[in-house]
Structures are given as structure tokens and as C-alpha cells.
A protein has these predicted regions:
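A residue-level signal for conserved active-site and pocket-lining positions in enzyme catalytic cores
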Residues: 20, 96, 114, 165, ...
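Helical element adjacent to the flavin cofactor pocket in flavoenzyme catalytic cores
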Residues: 133-193
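Central helical "cap/lid" subdomain
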Residues: 178, 184, 191-245
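Short, well-ordered alpha-helical microsegments
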Residues: 16-17, 162, 214-215
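Glycine-rich FAD pyrophosphate-binding loop
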Residues: 1
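Short acidic-glycine loop/turn motifs at beta-strand connectors
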Residues: 38-41, 186, 195
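Mobile amphipathic helical/loop "lid" adjacent to a hydrophobic cofactor/ligand pocket
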Residues: 7-135
Length: 245
């Protein structure tokens, strides 16, 4: 089954949208929302209206909780006007401290949002370069309190454009071949697959996979390949797939 895990808006991803239009790949409106639920506390809310903010009714009487949303307005308005040209060495965490923002806002809003978008632990979220954070939020309209961009996803999901690309390839194509290793020599490149030590022979090979996977299948990688590919960090991530009525 295909799940819509990729979302995009038309202004931020013009090349991707052009690709969809050129290949007559249909997209449909989707919803990208943000919610927080902190285990062991009464903190629970989402960004959709008063009912979403006070999804846990007990927080109607929680002054610290209510202050979060006033700080959101203040922080978003200020951040949307900040020039980050001279802030290359500043982190998000240090900026939040300078702004004297409450722990409720930091721990229950902005850090969870950053951690969710980039799939990172809260401590690492605070170490994010401020200029990267500001530019990303500006480009994606996330500082806007109103009129945020409409998000879209591919109709029938990624299989649609994968099949479209494959149909346009003039040569042979093979799917579901587990690549074991790639060996280069002066004459050609051998791509080994499966359990029987079978291989394809090519003049050139392009690896369109994650850096750690690429490094693991390249036989005798060069020093440059090792130095570049080993610096990409990965972590296991836990996702919850759900549907709402």
C-alpha cells in the first residue's frame, strides 16, 4: 500500500511542480498540520482553531500554556523579519535564550516542531544553525499566522511518477534487484546482485541512494569517496500512520 509521506507547495518546489505538469502527473490538495502531545503532562494541542488549542480542556486554566500562543505570535512576527546574513555562527538554542522566551514555548512548541520536521532529538534541534532555521521557515511560509501555502501530494502517491519515469526509459530496466557490491576496473564496472554472485556489466554507474548505503556497496572506495560519504549521519525514526475522520 502507498502512503502520502511527501508533501509540497507550488511556490517552494517549482521544478518538481513543472516536472509533474510536463508529465501530466496529477496532484491533489493535502493537509499539513502540527500537533503536540507530551506524555506524563496535560500538554496537548493542535494548530486548528480554539478547539484544537484546548483539545485538553484543563489547559483553559493553565496560564503558562495560554502564554505559549501569545509568544508564538510575537516570535513568528519577529523571526519573519530577521536578516540572518550576520548570524552564521548562531544556533537556534542560543537565539531562543537571548529572546527570553518561556520554557513552555521552547519545550512544547518550537523545539518539538523543529524535531518533527527534521526528525531529530530535542537537544540536537537546539544546535541547528539559526540561519538555516529562519530561511527554511520563511521559504515554506511557516512564520505566517494566516494565508499559509496550500500543500499538495501526488494523486495515487509516488508510484504514479515512478511508473511514468520508467515508461520513458528507452533501455532495459530492472526492479527489486538487491545490489550486493560494485567493483570497478579499467575496462568496466560490475554490479553484483542477488545471492548467486550474478552481475551486470556497465561502462558507468550512477548511485542514487543514501550515502551510507552507497559506501557499503562500493568495493575499494577512494579516499575522497570515503571522506565525503562517511559524514552523512542517519538515525532510526519512528512514524505513526493514522487516519482521521
Amino acid at each position: 500500500r502507498n502512503f502520502p509521506v511527501g508533501l509540497e507547495d507550488t511556490s517552494t518546489y517549482p521544478n518538481l511542480i513543472s516536472f509533474f505538469e510536463e508529465n501530466k502527473i496529477k496532484i491533489e490538495k493535502s493537509n499539513m498540520s502540527f500537533s503536540v502531545s507530551v506524555a506524563g503532562t496535560n500538554i496537548e494541542y493542535c494548530g486548528k482553531g480554539i478547539g484544537g488549542i484546548f483539545s485538553n480542556k484543563i489547559n483553559i486554566l493553565n496560564i503558562n500554556f495560554i502564554k505559549i500562543f501569545f509568544e508564538i505570535i510575537k516570535f513568528y512576527k519577529k523571526s519573519s523579519t530577521i536578516s540572518v546574513e550576520n548570524m552564521k555562527n548562531e544556533t537556534l538554542g542560543s537565539f531562543l535564550e537571548k529572546e527570553n522566551l518561556s520554557k513552555y514555548f521552547v519545550n512544547f512548541h518550537i523545539i518539538p516542531m523543529v524535531a518533527a520536521i527534521w526528525s531529530m532529538p530535542p537537544d540536537e534541534a537546539k544546535q541547528m544553525p539559526l540561519n538555516f532555521f529562519i530561511n527554511f521557515f520563511k521559504n515554506h511560509g511557516l512564520f505566517k499566522l494566516k494565508n499559509r501555502p496550500q500543500w499538495f501530494t501526488v494523486s495515487n502517491r509516488s508510484k504514479t511518477y515512478v511508473d511514468k519515469i520508467i515508461s520513458q526509459i528507452s533501455g532495459e530496466h530492472y526492479k527489486n534487484y538487491p545490489i550486493k557490491k560494485i567493483i570497478r576496473n579499467k575496462e568496466n564496472i560490475k554490479v553484483y546482485y542477488g545471492s548467486e554472485n550474478e552481475f551486470f556489466i556497465y561502462d558507468k554507474v550512477v548511485l542514487a541512494t543514501h550515502a551510507d548505503e552507497a559506501l557499503s556497496i562500493i568495493e575499494n572506495p577512494t579516499k575522497d569517496e570515503i571522506n565525503i560519504l562517511k559524514n552523512f549521519k542517519y538515525k532510526k525514526n519512528f512514524d505513526v500512520i493514522h487516519s482521521d475522520n
